[in-house]
Amino acid sequence: MKISSIDSIFAAWDGSITEARRLQSDMAERIVLKDEPNLLSEPTLLAGFDVGFEDEGRTTRAAAVLMNAGDLRLLETHVVRVPTSMPYVPGLLSFRELPALLQALTQLSRIPALVFVDGHGIAHPRRLGIAAHFGLVTNLPCIGVAKKRLVGDFVEPGTAFGEHTPILLHGTQVGWALRSKMHCKPLIISPGHKVSLHSALTWTQRCLTGYRLPEPTRQADRLASRRGQKIVSDLPSLL
């Protein structure tokens, strides 16, 4: 899949933390929280993305998977490595991880109808977590799936599988706490771009297969967390 120049995406950023936060606030105003029309039908392809680090953080490793939306069959896997461009700064994860994620996206042979990213969407201090930033610059419908809360308040969901409660930030709902597996902490689900709050929840639920993580980010997480792994060869496309 081709995308615009990664350098051009960051051209407006001068590298400072203050400017990055200002850009986040500006970009957050462009986020669309309505479903892309093709989500109302039956998307055929899903993608999942996650990031890990090697060499004591000097190398960013991004994993991408492409899946059949109907049966969650794995079609492609890719891992790319790029030099880490900035240190970890709370709330600015997307500026650190996005270059590698965009490189991983270019490896996909087809455009996914819906993307899951390991991280937050609008459940973020400035409503622009990694999933929202990724969705905005790629113009792809995107959902953030995070393992821990970053902002907001919620009532702990019930212990049964599928129980969920809204996450509120300053009185506005920004996501869901979802009990994706019994005896596990809830996931933090939030829309990134071109996905409604309702669809962010229902699509995540559709992709659960007995594990805590939905299948797209579970598979990407497995790839991104393998230390010292060489670039993963593609699985043959079965569509």
Curated annotation (Swiss-Prot):
Cofactor: Mg(2+)
Keyword Magnesium: yes
Main location: cytoplasm
GO cellular component: cytoplasm
Gene: nfi
One Pfam family linked to the record: Endonuclease_5
Alphabetically ordered keywords of this record: Cytoplasm, DNA damage, DNA repair, Endonuclease, Hydrolase, Magnesium, Metal-binding, Nuclease
Natural source organism: Xylella fastidiosa (strain Temecula1 / ATCC 700964)
Domain of life of the native organism: Bacteria
Site residues (Interaction with target DNA), renumbered to this chain: 88
Protein name: Endonuclease V
CDD domains, A to Z: Endonuclease_V
Function: DNA repair enzyme involved in the repair of deaminated bases. Selectively cleaves double-stranded DNA at the second phosphodiester bond 3' to a deoxyinosine leaving behind the intact lesion on the nicked DNA.
GO molecular function terms attached to this record: deoxyribonuclease V activity; magnesium ion binding; RNA endonuclease activity, producing 5'-phosphomonoesters; single-stranded RNA binding
Listed InterPro entries: Endonuclease-V
Entry EC no(s): 3.1.21.7
